[in-house]
């Protein structure tokens, strides 16, 4: 059994209405030992109707209060999911220097200031070109900002591609994906296994198992597990599949973080 969820969102994120209490109580019901909440911090997000930032002081205050209430039943950790894009790296570095997070995810939610969630992203390009450009931006991000513990859902874009995963494979983008993986390993940045891919009907987690396997083949060890749940019902989503996926990809462990330090848990 996987005993932790290290990617989930509460009402501190613009796309969730779930209270932290509801997520914690669900995690306890599921028998989890650790819950690391990772709310969105997407600075300079171009879609102004949604504010993907939050008051970090209030976030830490709330988490401290919740540890007093629930700390004897589950270990609560304070994480954050940073939306990476050019122009925000200095502000993110400043943020992380001021706050003592347990865990930091870096993610790509924008490609050249457009969210591939929206159909307009795909209107002026082929599907293959749109996916390739997304991977290029990951390399650009980690070249300039590497103060993260894992890179989140590195093939996130496939969730929203016009054909979803029908024409997608690791092999099709192997050259750039290998470059991403090698770069992450060289910077001691891990990957996450994000089970939301199953929720979106892809039939695999994000990233695809072939990417996880290649990461392991190239020496990668840091692998966290997250549901990307935005409601309690999606917490630990399809985690029952995770142990066999990890083993098939060459892992005998998964990873948690406390105070930005990796700890390995045997399968």
Show where each model-derived region lies:
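Charged catalytic cores and adjacent phosphate/nucleic-acid-binding surfaces used
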Residues: 1-6, 10, 16, 20, ...
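An N-terminally biased module of ancient metal coordination in phosphate/nucleic-acid-related enzymes
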Residues: 1-86, 95-98, 160-162, 167-171, ...
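Structural preference for beta-strand elements that scaffold enzyme active sites
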Residues: 2-5, 34-36, 75-79, 102-105, ...
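Phenylalanine-focused residue identity feature
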Residues: 6, 12, 45, 52-54, ...
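Conserved residues at the C-terminal ends of beta-strands
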Residues: 38, 107, 154, 194, ...
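Extended substrate/RNA-proximal surfaces in nucleic-acid metabolism proteins
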Residues: 49, 53-186
